[in-house]
């Protein structure tokens, strides 16, 4: 319980890590790299905690300004279906007795009722909080769950629309969409998805250029794929 504020800080950073990005291929790659970095969130959390005499984990004490910012962030969110303490209990059970699966928590938070508005839903932060406590790669786990629930293509188009087509959407929400689409692109890369496969999936051809509303997914992923491949020494396919 004493690591409560620090865990919330990790979740806040985890969900808002792309706030300084802009909607370009380089920014999308930056978000993809941020996703890879966030895979170590849980390990970083553990490295900043130590056991008390009663076996509790005592977190690194953040500065007052951090605590105040964290409180403000939590107060701006609407009421959660599952309070933080309940999430902590469920995470503890999941790690010790395997009684609270991420699928069950996802459903209890009513995140299985459609993608519309999900990025601004405070219960998505609660689900991320649960994953930070239970998963080694929480951002990867979250995007994987969204994809398994709603479909890879549906999630990709939804995030792309928020980034580029949505009206009256805050920059913060667009930044979160960029972060999660970056996570999706990393997932594609790790699973061996080539730009050629994405081009085929989204029916991108010269005759459809500037007419296909989702050809940008292909162009974004092509840039991300090339740069990730160059960093990993993975050979580029003959046709990307």
UniProtKB/Swiss-Prot annotation:
Short motif RxLR-dEER, span: 43-58
Induction: Expression is induced during host plant infection.
Signal peptide: 1-23
Keywords: Host cytoplasm, Host nucleus, Secreted, Signal, Virulence
Domain of life, per lineage: Eukaryota
Subcellular location: Secreted; Host cytoplasm; Host nucleus; Host nucleus, Host nucleolus
GO CC annotations on file: extracellular region; host cell cytoplasm; host cell nucleolus
Transmembrane segments: none
Domain commentary: The RxLR-dEER motif acts to carry the protein into the host cell cytoplasm through binding to cell surface phosphatidylinositol-3-phosphate.
Protein purpose: Effector that enhances P.infestans colonization of Nicotiana benthamiana leaves.
Family: Belongs to the RxLR effector family.
Protein name: RxLR effector protein PexRD20
């Amino acid at each position: 319980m004493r690591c409560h504020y620090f865990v919330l800080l990790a979740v806040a950073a985890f969900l808002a890590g792309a706030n300084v990005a802009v909607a370009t291929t380089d920014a999308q790659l930056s978000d993809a790299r941020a996703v890879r970095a966030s895979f170590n969130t849980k390990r970083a959390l553990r490295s900043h905690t130590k056991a008390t005499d009663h076996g509790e984990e005592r977190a690194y004490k953040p500065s007052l300004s951090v605590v105040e910012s964290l409180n403000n962030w939590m107060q701006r969110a609407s009421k959660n279906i599952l309070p933080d303490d309940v999430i902590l209990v469920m995470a503890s059970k999941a790690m010790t007795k395997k009684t609270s699966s991420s699928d069950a928590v996802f459903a209890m938070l009513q995140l299985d009722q459609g993608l519309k508005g999900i990025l601004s839903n405070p219960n998505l932060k609660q689900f991320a909080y649960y994953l930070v406590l239970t998963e080694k790669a929480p951002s990867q786990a979250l995007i994987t769950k969204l994809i398994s629930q709603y479909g890879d293509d549906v999630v990709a188009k939804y995030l792309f629309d928020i980034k580029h087509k949505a009206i009256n959407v805050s920059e913060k929400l667009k930044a979160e969409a960029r972060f999660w689409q970056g996570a999706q692109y990393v997932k594609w890369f790790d699973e061996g998805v080539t730009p050629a496969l994405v081009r085929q999936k989204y029916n991108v051809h010269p005759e459809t250029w500037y007419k296909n509303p989702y050809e940008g997914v292909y162009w974004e992923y092509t840039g991300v794929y090339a740069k990730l491949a160059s960093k990993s020494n993975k050979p580029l396919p003959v046709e990307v």
